Amino acid sequence: MTVTLTERAELRLRAFLQGTANPTDTKGIRVGVSDGGCSGYQYTLDIANEPKPDDVIEQQGRVKIYIDPQAAALINGVVVDFVEGLMDSGFKFSNPNATDTCGCGQSFQAGDCTPAAVPCS
């Protein structure tokens, strides 16, 4: 299982984690997917105070990464970057498991197991 953070993503995530209330040694980010978006799956990225019992745990630099075990196969090999532009900025996911992505870049399909799509908001 591998989720890779670019240097920009790691720096931004470290800043988020340090800026949250009660920073602890177990605080990290939880990466996963949920049903949704116009292609079927959308990425989730949340601050977590500690891992859940079944989480896959990785660390890159000073950022702990907790991976939802049900999403592990869908996000294995994902590279997370942070991009800044005139029109938008945020975390971008490059997923080798995605068989298709939507035009807005917020959701993806993965083989035969993709749930029904809903329009992007």
UniProtKB/Swiss-Prot annotation:
Disulfide bonds: none
InterPro entries: Fe-S_cluster_asmbl/transfer (IPR050322), FeS_biogenesis (IPR000361), FeS_cluster_insertion (IPR016092), FeS_cluster_insertion_CS (IPR017870), HesB-like_dom_sf (IPR035903)
GO cellular component, one term: cytosol
Superkingdom field: Bacteria
Residues passing through the membrane, by range: none
SUPFAM superfamilies: HesB-like domain (SSF89360)
Alphabetical UniProt keywords: Nitrogen fixation
Gene3D superfamilies: HesB-like domain
A Pfam entry, by short name: Fe-S_biosyn
Gene Ontology biological process: iron-sulfur cluster assembly; nitrogen fixation
GO molecular function: 2 iron, 2 sulfur cluster binding
Keyword hit for Transmembrane: no
UniProt similarity note: Belongs to the HesB/IscA family.
NCBIfam families named in the record: iron-sulfur cluster assembly accessory protein
Record-given protein name: Protein HesB
